[in-house]
A protein has these predicted regions:
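HTH-adjacent hinge/linker in prokaryotic transcriptional regulators
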Residues: 3-115
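Residue-level recognition of alpha-helical structural elements
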Residues: 93, 112, 134, 195, ...
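Glycine-rich phosphate-binding loops that contact phosphosugars or nucleotide phosphates
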Residues: 121-239, 244-248
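Internal, active-site/partner-interface "lid" segment
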Residues: 250-275
């Protein structure tokens, strides 16, 4: 997608004022079912929108596509980048639950924390990095691991750059970088810079993060595919919970002592609600 080749939704919006009534009917159907166009052929779009196949073929050409296959490829490419594709949500939640279940199974099928957990538990310092949609996942991981051990920081904080966080790292440290799709353009440079410090780099993201994996020592892949317009991070947060629990399990005695000490401070400051 470029300014010269905008996404399908924008092409439809731009073209609507100039379309014939039949083309408008088809275009409005396409606009409301963008995600489904990844699988529909021209005959299906024609039938579902109540127009002729010739109308659909003509509309595709007006939108800059040669045929339905190009439209399908375009929509699939958009979805693979994580770009939201607006459309009517599926009726009920069965498809959503099925996809969430598939994501969880895929995330845990190849998950091996037997090396990563002790590595994190024994590190001098942990820096957890996340950008954009990955930031909440990074924040949650930092909060969970901070219950189990000290010296766990999150970066970048608002108004903060990464340089000061990375400059102090060395071979005894671990950097956990969360990088789900729609990452900033500097992402691969960040991974390489973290690895250049000598720290062990654990990289977590969807399958597309593999292109950044050469600089990382360890890779955790979590699918974020969804049947709705937006990516789902349910599997990612579940893996975060499992990872934090595994880190705690590596140093149970000290972890329990830290949790108890944190609880005492909570009580002293009256920070948490009571039941």
């Amino acid at each position: 997608v470029t300014p010269q080749h905008p996404p399908l939704g924008q092409r439809l919006a731009d073209a609507l004022p100039e379309l014939s009534p039949q083309e408008t009917r088809a275009a409005e159907f396409m606009r409301d079912h963008l995600a489904d166009l990844a699988v529909y052929n021209a005959s299906e779009v024609a039938r579902l929108s109540g127009v002729s196949k010739a109308t659909i073929s003509r509309l595709y050409r007006r939108l800059g596509f040669d045929d339905a296959e190009q439209v399908r490829d375009h929509v699939r490419a958009l979805r693979s980048t994580g770009a939201p594709i607006a459309g009517e949500p599926p009726a009920g939640f069965s498809a959503h639950l099925a996809r969430e279940s598939d994501n969880l199974r895929a995330a845990f099928a190849d998950l091996d924390l037997s090396v990563i957990a002790p590595l994190i538990a024994g590190a001098r310092r942990i820096v957890v990095i996340g950008f954009r949609n990955s930031y909440p996942v990074a924040l949650h991981l930092r909060q969970q691991m901070a219950q189990a051990r000290d010296a766990v920081t999150l970066a970048p904080l608002p108004g903060q750059s990464l340089g000061e966080e990375l400059a102090a790292l060395g071979p005894d440290d671990v950097v956990v970088i969360i990088g789900f799709r729609r990452r900033p353009s500097s992402f691969e440079r960040v991974v390489a810079a973290a690895a250049a410090t000598g720290a062990s780099v654990v990289l977590m993201g969807d399958d597309s993060v593999r292109r950044s994996a050469p600089s990382a020592a360890y890779l955790i892949v979590c699918p974020v595919d969804a049947v709705t317009a937006f990516d789902s991070y349910g599997a990612a947060f579940s893996v975060v919970s499992a990872l934090a629990a595994a880190v705690l399990g590596e140093s149970l005695a000290s972890g329990r002592a830290r949790i108890a000490a944190i609880g005492d401070v909570y009580d002293g400051l009256d920070e948490l609600e009571r039941f």
